[in-house]
């Protein structure tokens, strides 16, 4: 029996990596989202999806999964922590990676 829901354990490392890619200047938020939509046939990109879920919820899930598993891939990227602390939570706050 494994801790955490299967979808969360697959989805949140992808969201986390998209944040790291953005932070490191490898790709823009738009490029990352577009790449996953067209390259992987996802209905929306990882950053747009994170903002739909709520960046605070994403952070809480990553922190819990990281604590429970110790898996480095679940350790929240620092920009996510900073954004949540600043109240930039995504769609419900009107701003996150994107403005709504």
Regions found by a protein language model. Give the residues of each.
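NAD(P)-dependent Rossmann-like dehydrogenase/reductase catalytic/cofactor-binding core
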Residues: 1-5, 13, 19-24, 28-100
């Amino acid at each position: 029996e494994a801790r955490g829901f299967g979808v969360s354990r697959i989805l949140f490392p992808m969201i986390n990596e998209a944040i790291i890619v953005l932070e490191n200047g490898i790709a823009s938020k738009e490029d990352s989202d577009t790449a996953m939509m067209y390259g992987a046939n996802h209905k929306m990109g990882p950053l747009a999806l994170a903002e739909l879920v709520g960046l605070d919820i994403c952070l809480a899930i990553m922190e819990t999964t990281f604590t429970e598993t110790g898996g480095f891939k679940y350790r929240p990227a620092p920009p996510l922590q900073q954004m949540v602390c600043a109240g930039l939570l995504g769609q419900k706050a009107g701003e996150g990676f994107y403005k709504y």
